[in-house]
Structure formats: structure tokens, C-alpha cells
């Protein structure tokens, strides 16, 4: 990665998870904005500002996939990492086969997220 600070947006309806991700990522030099409310995140979204958006897939008001689509309609130049609490292998297979190829994104990570796994994914996506 270059010396320019990468900016990340985190959207997770569980405030503790959003805060934890923010703390971890900031510790490694990223600039992070975190929102627990998807609509607030959308209202505060500025095209061209974020290198990566980390989205919870399952949120009460709007799914991470729907929110991703709304962000993409405003700015096509960011990358995305989806968070999921899905535990069943069949659910993962469905995501990989049916959802991600249509969206052009295949990056996802299972909750609870370890610091190591999070950083590996983020560095891999941004490099």
C-alpha cells in the first residue's frame, strides 16, 4: 500500500462491532468512519472519499447488499468487504454462487471477526 492513508467506511447495526473494527483499523493507520445506522451512513457518504466500505450483510432496515447498491450508484470506485454472521456452509455457498458474482464483489468475512483475518482481508483488497 502507498503512504497515503486509506479511508474506510464501516456500516454495522451492532455499534460494538463497528467500534471494534474502527479501533483495530485505526491502530494500523487507516482513517475510519463508522455508522450503526445505514441511512445515516448513506446521508453522510461522499463520492470519492472511501477506498473500502465494510458492510454488515444482515441489518434490520436495509441489507448490506442493498446499501452497497446505493453507494455504488453514487461512486463506483470503492471496494467492499461484507460481514456475515452466517454459520451454515450452505448459506455461504449460496452467497458465493448466487449473490457475489452478480455484484462483482466476492470479499466477505465471517463474524466474529479476528483482528488477523480482518487485516489480511483489508490489505489484500486494498493492494
Residue ranges and their predicted role:
Residues 36-37, 63-67:
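Acidic catalytic/metal-coordinating carboxylates
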Residues 66, 87-109, 116, 120:
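Alpha4 helix (beta4-alpha4-beta5 surface) of REC/receiver domains from two-component response regulators
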Residues 12, 56, 84:
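Active-site residues of response regulator receiver
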Residues 59:
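Receiver (REC) domain active-site loop signature in two-component systems and cognate sites
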Residues 15-33, 103:
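Two-component/phosphorelay signaling modules centered on CheY-like receiver
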Residues 34-52:
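Acidic, metal-coordinating helix/loop segments flanking the phosphotransfer/catalytic sites
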Residues 65-78, 97:
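Short amphipathic alpha-helix used as the core "switch/output" element in two-component signaling
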Residues 1-7, 114-127:
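Non-catalytic signal-transmission and effector/linker regions of two-component phosphorelay proteins
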Amino acid at each position: 500500500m502507498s503512504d497515503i492513508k486509506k479511508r474506510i467506511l464501516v456500516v454495522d447495526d451492532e455499534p460494538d462491532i463497528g467500534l471494534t473494527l474502527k479501533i483495530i483499523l485505526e491502530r494500523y493507520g487507516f482513517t475510519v468512519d463508522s455508522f450503526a445506522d445505514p441511512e445515516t451512513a448513506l446521508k453522510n457518504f461522499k463520492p470519492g472519499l472511501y477506498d473500502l466500505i465494510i458492510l454488515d450483510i444482515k441489518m434490520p432496515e436495509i441489507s448490506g447488499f442493498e446499501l452497497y447498491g446505493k453507494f455504488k450508484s453514487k461512486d463506483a470506485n470503492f471496494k467492499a468487504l461484507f460481514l456475515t454472521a452466517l454459520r451454515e456452509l450452505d448459506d455461504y455457498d449460496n452467497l458465493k454462487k448466487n449473490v457475489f458474482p452478480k455484484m462483482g464483489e466476492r470479499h466477505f468475512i465471517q463474524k466474529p471477526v479476528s483482528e488477523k483475518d480482518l487485516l489480511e482481508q483489508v490489505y489484500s483488497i486494498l493492494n
